[in-house]
A protein has these predicted regions:
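Conserved catalytic core of the tyrosine transesterase superfamily
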Residues: 1-153
Length: 153
């Protein structure tokens, strides 16, 4: 300060501590999926885990983003507002097709649950972020899973 030397001010900055998030194992994810009673949440959790998506990425998915021929999904406005292509596992495609037969929304892959799955056909908004987070917290508490789930919760 004031262009004057500071005697004894040879300070070293403390290193940043970065903690890695807990990783959910396949067995733990299977317990989460099995314990989730609401079909749309069950399919959503399975989809996020199997494709490595973030919560917002999964909510924004549209029917047209699924490329079944090339077995990939177009994720729009991912982290950093970039698009990316994600591999689509065959089992996930099967689950998504079965789920779509239930709601039949022509645009949204995970339509709002506000009017139930019967009203999902005409839904113009995706599932509620807070509802998904609350459902996951309830399921993980129910099965006794103590891990922090960074991509979902």
């Amino acid at each position: 300060m004031l262009d004057k030397p500071w005697p004894g001010a040879d300070l070293t900055k403390a290193p940043k501590v970065s903690r890695l998030p807990d990783i959910v194992t396949v067995a733990q994810m299977q317990r989460i999926v099995d314990a989730t009673r609401v079909l749309s949440y069950r399919v959503f959790f399975f989809t996020l885990y199997s494709m490595g998506l973030r919560l917002g990425e999964g909510l924004q998915l549209r029917v047209g983003d699924i490329d079944a021929d090339r077995m990939r999904v177009h994720v729009r406005d991912a982290k950093g507002n970039r698009d990316r292509l994600v591999p689509l596992p065959a089992r996930t495609l099967e689950v998504l097709r079965e789920f779509w037969k239930v709601h039949r929304n022509p645009v949204l892959l995970f339509p709002s649950r506000q009017k139930g799955l019967e009203g999902a056909l005409g839904a113009t908004a995706h599932m509620d972020r807070g509802g998904v987070q609350q459902a996951l917290r309830q399921v993980t508490a129910q099965i006794g899973l103590k891990k922090e789930l960074p991509r979902i919760a």
